[in-house]
Amino acid sequence: MTEMDHLAGERVELLAAAREAAAHAWTPYSHFRVGAAVAVDTAEGRRIVSGANVENASYGLTLCAERAALAAACQLGVAGEPPRVTAVAVVGLDAQPGECMPCGACRQWLAELAPDAAYYVEGVEETLHLDDLLPRRFTLNR
């Protein structure tokens, strides 16, 4: 299997997992269902975790699908270290193809927890990376 075959397979697998997660979104206000899937390298091997957006009447408390999935990924890592996220996929069931790009808060979460990950969006053919999503991003020098 070539690297291109591997990436194509990963993309299909993660987008399918994100689509399944989106079906479980709680969106009584916007009716805009989003799912995300994250590939994580763990000591036991590669795992896929997912999350869906969960809305709240106080909109600022709404949890995006990307952040839900990244929070789940943190549970798979070593305590005190970020998870080893290799790829993230996002699907919006009620979105036009390519419309479901991450919000600013999710982009910052990606910068913190998945800086080297490939980013797949349903309807966008190219594989995106953090520099595409958040150029000149804020970081703290540690």
Question: PLM features: residue spans?
Answer:
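Glycine/charged-rich beta-loop-alpha catalytic/anionic-binding loops adjacent to active sites
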Residues: 42-56, 87-88
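Short beta-strand scaffold segments in enzyme catalytic cores
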Residues: 31-42
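A generic structural signal for short beta-strands and their flanking turns/coil linkers
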Residues: 32-34, 50, 84-86
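Short HxH-centered metal-ligating active-site micro-motif
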Residues: 63, 67-95
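Charged, well-structured alpha/beta interaction segments
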Residues: 27-31, 46-47
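Compact, glycine-rich, soluble single-domain proteins
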Residues: 52-67
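C-terminal binding/interaction regions
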Residues: 2-27, 82-142
